[in-house]
Amino acid sequence: MRILPLIWISGILASSVAEASEPGEVAWGFETASPVRSSPSIGGGGTVYVGSVDKKVYALNGATGEKKWEFVTGGEVLSSPAIGSDGTVYVGSVDKKVYALNGESGIKKWEFLTGDKVYSSPAIGKDGSVIIGSLDDHLYALDGRTGVKKWTTKIGDVGSSPSIGLDGTVYVGSLDTKLYALDGKTGEKKWEFKTQGRIGSSPAIGLDGTVYFGSVDDKLYALDGQTGAKKWEFKTGGNVEGSPVVGPGNVVYVGSEDKKVY
């Protein structure tokens, strides 16, 4: 059974898209103690990992919704978990920390303390590095096995989640209105692009390396991933805080606070 997760006010719903007698039939629901604002991630064996405002990270059986384990952090978990090649679950918390958890048991492998709240979701590089931002104005690269800091770069408060290009370049937006491209090995800035509003949208990367993202200036941008040069911009009727996706035929889909999807 393939599971399509849907978030509800204080829990997680799973709707079956493979075996339901009716489209969108609810397969199961799991209730947490507080709203769920994190997006679920699916690991090996179909386990669903998700964070909650109740300060916990949950691992759920993807077929039944039964809880496998929970891990308590010191703050709300708004960050969406990322899963390493070995099954390790990486997630940030409002308690200023980044956690690495054993995907099978939920036992903590390590934690890393940043200087402020972590809303950003991690991205995992080809070498296993965990890239994540904090509201302390910095983007961090951590060793996925040990949690040791490899590099950190000051770029402004990071509410956006980073994306990693095929060449290892890290792209991330900041509340300082800029999108940054950083060298994934060193954290050195390659280029930056300024918009007219804060960026909470996480970048999407096309097959040709084009970087797409939205801004609170109501626009969707397309930038050359190598140079940062603007290819085009599209103005919507409202803030673009959601993250775009790139579909077949290089079609870009994005939502806006003008109540429309483009």
Task: Name each model-derived stretch.
Residues 18-262:
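Extracytoplasmic/lumenal domain signature
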Residues 5-15:
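Bacterial N-terminal signal peptides
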